[in-house]
C-alpha cells in the first residue's frame, strides 16, 4: 500500500492552495487503482480549517465538509499543536476526528511515507 503525507500551510479561505490540496487528497482516495494510505497534517494558517461549525458565505466550496469527507474515507488528519495554540485552537473546537499532533508526529509520518507533498 502506498502511503502519502500531505502537509498544508495556507489558510482555508482567501487562497485556493488548501482547497486544491484537499481536492488532490479526495481525488487520490476516489481514483487510486490500489489502496492508498493518506495522512493530512495542517500547519500554520491551515490549522483554522479544522474548526468545526464553519459557514461559507458564497457556498463555492466548504473546507470543513471536505475534511469531513476525507475523515469518512479513512484519511488521518491532524493539526500542528504549536500552530493551533498560537491561533487559540483547542481539541474541543475541532471537527470531530481531527487530532492535534506534534512536530515529532509529523517527523514520524514523514519518515514512514512513500510520498510527501507540501502545499
Model-derived segments and their meaning:
Residues 86-119:
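C-terminal structural segments of small proteins and small subunits
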Residues 53-58, 94-96:
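Short glycine-enriched, charge-decorated loop/helix-capping segments at active-site entrances
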Residues 2:
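Nucleotide donor/acceptor-binding cores
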Amino acid at each position: 500500500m502506498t502511503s502519502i503525507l500531505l502537509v498544508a500551510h495556507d489558510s482555508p479561505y482567501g487562497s485556493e492552495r488548501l482547497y486544491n490540496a484537499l481536492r488532490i487528497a479526495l481525488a487520490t482516495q476516489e481514483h487510486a487503482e490500489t489502496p492508498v494510505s493518506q495522512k493530512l497534517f495542517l500547519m500554520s494558517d491551515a490549522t483554522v480549517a479544522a474548526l468545526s461549525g464553519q459557514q461559507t458565505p458564497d457556498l463555492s466550496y466548504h473546507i470543513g465538509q471536505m475534511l469531513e469527507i476525507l475523515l469518512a474515507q479513512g484519511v488521518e488528519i491532524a493539526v500542528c499543536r504549536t500552530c493551533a495554540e498560537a491561533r487559540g485552537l483547542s481539541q474541543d473546537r475541532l471537527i470531530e476526528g481531527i487530532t492535534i499532533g506534534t512536530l515529532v508526529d509529523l517527523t514520524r509520518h514523514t519518515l514512514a511515507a512513500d510520498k510527501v507533498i507540501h502545499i
